[in-house]
Amino acid sequence: MAEYWDIYDENRNKTGALHRRGDPFGPGERHLGVEIWTLDEQGRVLLTRRDLRKRFGGLWECPGGSALVGEDSRTAVRRELREETGLDLGDAEPELLGTTVYEEEFVDTYAVRLPFALADVRLQEGETTDARLATFDEVERAVLEGAPWLAGPIRERTLPLLPKLRTFRAQAKK
């Protein structure tokens, strides 16, 4: 079944047009994407490995994806985390760290602290092949140094938001 997204203009206004995944974008067209940095109760970060058949296959990232037609980013980030990992945010409210633009995508990056164990993670076939918990310091170094195991877009999108992610982590420890 085809996946459809709302089309936005360069100022993040919905145009009323729809985009089918895999089709080329027109000039100035964008869609909405989300990602979520999920910290467990010890402050470790959930990373998932991309399916080998996907772009950046075999590399690690935080869960995320594209908002479907009619979804806002908060709805999309909840759905993406649940689909890719089986984790449900329940009453937890993810904090929006900021928005970056990557290729034809506005990406809203969120962070959340969630009580879960790695054994709770259920991978989504065709999307994720593995999951692990990394220390915050390990993830921060990977972003700063451009570690070869980290999916490139994650580095590009996280680098400008790293100060906000650090602040979130510090506040979440309290």
Q: Where on the chain are the PLM-derived regions?
A:
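Conserved hydrophobic "DFG−1" position in protein kinase catalytic cores
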Residues: 7, 38, 47, 111-112, ...
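Helix-adjacent hinge/juxtasegments
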Residues: 56-88
